[in-house]
Amino acid sequence: MIGRVSIKISNQRNSYKFTLNRNITILRGDSGTGKTTLYDMIRDYNNLGRESGVKISGGNIVTLEGRNWEDELDKLSNSVVVIDEGSKFVFSKEFASKVKGCDNYFLIITRSYLSQLQYSVDEIYSIKGTGKNKEFKRKHHHNWGSRKYNYWR
């Protein structure tokens, strides 16, 4: 995939709207903010389709989990792959190698730093919004031109 991918995922209770700008996006946040709900909605849609009550727009969006993650990932192309924080394989060198060698975008839900992956500080988000409507908000704001953050001096 190349470029931005705008995604909307909704059901009767929740609506998530966000844009992925690069191949790796990290979603962080406190408990109860809706990260796992988002993941579960996507997984339900993958398993049940329309019967899940979930609507997805923005391309092929899938969840990746379990022992067979490598085989499942090898089958995917030009997809948005969503991984929940319980998936230990995201810390492996094998996963990092697979990410480098494919054309998918990844949305990884984690509170941990993933040192083996190259991702931008600008692509770390949290979920903001109350009630039904939620969107991603950039976690790290920086002003490289200010004296306080000018690391080149």
Question: What is the predicted role of each segment?
Answer:
Residues 69-93:
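Conserved P-loop NTPase "ATPase switch" module shared by AAA+ and STAND
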Residues 27:
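Hydrophobic anchor at the beta1->P-loop junction of P-loop NTPases
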Residues 99-128:
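Sensor-1/coupling segment of RecA-like P-loop NTPase cores
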Residues 44-55:
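Post-Walker A helix-loop "phosphate-sensing" segment adjacent to the P-loop in P-loop NTPases
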Residues 33-35:
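Conserved glycine(s) of the Walker
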Residues 122-153:
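RecA-like P-loop NTPase motor core
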Residues 38-40:
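Post-Walker A alpha-helix
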Residues 1-16, 135-138, 145:
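N-terminal pre-Walker A segment at the start of P-loop NTPase domains
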